[in-house]
């Protein structure tokens, strides 16, 4: 079973799961997963992994995430996008400086409500399930906007590029931008350009080592101990500080955690193939 890590480009109006199913058929691989669900109406970068590499998602460099979005002022939809639009109201035209100032006001750390219709889990429950009891109204998530810039303003459409932390919903951000301009707003277009170090390159196979958000450590004893999953001694490692590391050996690598002078395997015997 070949381990593969690559970036696919999800088309618009297809769910991430349905797109994954098509990739499974294309590559004839049963065990395949993705990181970072894209809304059905959104398109762009989706990190794909197969077999053993599906266990690596939480260790990858996936932040910041960069998007290009188009916001339509004056439109209202509970989904905050082009699905189920309930009404459109005429909105006054703004000057460019007002738009830029409004966008820049969202830079930095902040709290955000996930959209009512989303797959985000809050306290172990999906946001759309919490919505039924209005619980979601009190559930905010911490996010950060690293960069945001105006690409084009052709009233009532604002197109902007934004780089954010994991967990940020661009639909919610678009709604908040519109609200700050004293109107409703929905996204009419959303494309994810990259997830941290990951960008679309025609599904090119990637070396996972280059994308791990971990420091390399070095095992100074017999690699056979790693291969057999034997108990590890902290004195056999070059770096002995607390932390999570990857260790290469033969044609494999392991992910270990050092804490309180003890070494624990997080993952082991992951075969390198790229």
Task: Name what the model sees in each region.
Residues 126, 156-197:
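Pseudouridine synthase
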Residues 1-13, 17-38, 42-45, 63, ...:
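Accessory RNA 3′-end/elbow-binding domains used by RNA modification enzymes
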Residues 10, 71-73, 132, 152, ...:
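Short, structured patches in soluble enzyme cores that scaffold and shape functional sites
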Residues 133-152, 191-199:
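Pepsin-like aspartyl protease folds
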Residues 109-130:
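Long, charge-dense, solvent-exposed interaction surfaces that engage phosphate-rich ligands
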